[in-house]
Design a protein with these regions (language model features):
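Short, surface-exposed acidic
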Residues: 15-26, 45-52
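Short acidic alpha-helix initiation/capping motifs at coil-to-helix transition points
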Residues: 1-3, 28-32
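Phosphate-handling DNA/RNA-contact segment within nucleic-acid enzymes
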Residues: 30-168
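Non-catalytic interaction/clamp surfaces of large macromolecular machines
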Residues: 1-22
Length: 170
């Protein structure tokens, strides 16, 4: 899709393989902030459900619009491989550079780690704590499948407890 070229250029520029991009479910949210909302409405979701999911926000001027646009998208999965939120990296000069889904009933970034669903199955007894999404993905592609990252700038006690549940060495 030509609309996703900017995202694909970024990911291939970071030397990610198609296999790695597929494994992590990476994608691109286009510049039109209404596409996701329109798609979800067609699938039968109500505006309230879309807003509560954290994928969109309501503004008086624009109505219900996607939270993420012109961003490479990183699905955030729980330990059972269920998507519970998203991270998005802006393409270009926009701010913020990285944006996570807001806290929802199913997404609490303090209690989750990016990549833990894959690191847990590595069963190495070790976990490598990285700074962010791209670090985790690059480490996995290089064969270090026990890499994880916190979701945001703070590393929490809950995340430390998670690490200790799944690894002897950090």
């Amino acid at each position: 899709d030509p609309r996703g070229e900017v995202g694909m250029r970024y990911l291939t520029g970071r030397k990610l393989t198609d296999e790695t991009m597929h494994h992590f479910g990476l994608g691109y949210a286009g510049k039109n902030g209404e596409q996701v909302v329109q798609y979800l409405r067609k699938k039968g979701f109500t505006d309230e459900e879309i807003k509560d999911s954290g994928l969109a926000m309501f503004s008086e001027q624009r109505g219900l619009r996607s939270q993420f646009w012109n961003r490479v998208m990183f699905p955030i999965q729980d330990i059972n491989h269920r998507v519970i939120g998203f991270g998005g990296r802006v393409m270009g000069d926009g701010e913020p550079k990285y944006l996570n889904s807001p806290e929802t009933m199913i997404f609490d970034k303090r209690r989750n780690l990016y990549g833990l669903n894959f690191a847990r199955t590595a069963r190495t007894g070790n976990i490598i704590l990285c700074e962010g999404y791209m670090d985790v993905i690059a480490m996995h592609q290089a064969g270090f499948t026990q890499a994880v990252a916190s979701l945001g700038t703070a590393f929490t006690v809950e995340q430390a407890n998670l690490l200790h549940r799944y690894a002897e060495n950090i």
